[in-house]
Amino acid sequence: GLLKQGYPADKIIVNDPNEEKRAFFAQYGIAVSTDNEQSITQSQVVLFAVKPQVLANVCKPLSAVDFSDKLIISIAAGISTARLAELLPTAKSIVRVMPNTPALVGEGMAGLFADKNTSEIDRTFAEDLLSAVGKTTWVTNEAQMHAVTAASGSSPAYFFQFLEAMQQGLMEMGLDENQSR
């Protein structure tokens, strides 16, 4: 989404322990690394797109890094801005984001919440960044992110269940499997 919106690949660094994923991003001219600390040191914005259960392990070796001049964006479901601040003690600007699955094809919806220390400039950057993969909406109370997470995680499943029921109904009315799709 970012590259399609014209964001320069040379402004992005992707850190991933998986060699195949690094190769995938490298083919688009994106810098890749396995050294989180080095990448973070040279970045203004740090996006944590990891499973919530591994976030603490990712952050632990970074606790001594100075995040005071960086925007932290987290896509780790259920991890509060307070918890992120505990994991990254020097972080001043933290935004939680919960995109839904259609974001993978640029048609998503993302809920955002910013902690009280996040500047308007950082809020705007986070919103612009997420707008590259769909629409955005800000919530004013972090507890509302639970509802956003539930909707983001569940709504695609309900939609596909609805489509399967429609297909089954059409097949019961005489259409074959291909026609009912």
Regions found by a protein language model. Name each.
Residues 83, 87-93, 109-147, 158-181:
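Internal alpha-helical scaffold of NAD(P)-dependent oxidoreductase catalytic cores
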Residues 5-26:
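NAD(P)-binding Rossmann-fold cofactor-contacting core
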Residues 8-9, 33, 68, 176:
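Conserved H-loop
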Residues 12, 22, 39, 176-181:
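Small-residue helix-packing motif on alpha-helices
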Residues 1-6, 78-81:
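Membrane-interface segments of envelope glycosyltransferases acting on lipid-linked substrates or membrane lipids
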Residues 19, 25-28, 36-48, 52-112, ...:
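Rossmann-like NAD(P)(H) cofactor-binding subdomain of soluble oxidoreductases
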Residues 31-36, 138-139:
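Short acidic-hydrophobic, aromatic-tinged amphipathic segments that line or gate anion-handling sites
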